[in-house]
Amino acid sequence: MEQLSGVVHVDRENLTVVGVRHVTLDEFWVRGHIPGRPLLPGVLMIESAAQLCSYAGRVLIPDMGFIGFARCDDAKFRGTVVPPSTLYVIAKMVDVSRRRIVAECQGVCNGNLVFECKITGMPV
């Protein structure tokens, strides 16, 4: 289940990537995740961040292979994402080893911070 529309920026020097997710009214969750007032579920925001971290691991650390989701820590939700809108996800690698990557992630929608978390990934 693809949760990113694309990657818009890669900064190899600072181990940072920015992804974009276009949130539309025809997504599978819209009808049921708060009827009459659709809100992008927090778990899908986290999944967007995890997918971006997997991409970042492959691009920024090529010999690491595929990075799978291992853990999410310190998740905080500070706003809502209502379709139609665009969610930007930023991931900065803060710890990289052969066994794992750790990234600090943020989601921004309409210029507002809507979530932040720390994602850990591991080669699978």
Residues covered by each model-derived region:
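Hydrophobic residues on conserved beta-strands that form the core of alpha/beta folds
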Residues: L4-S5, F69-C72, V102, E116
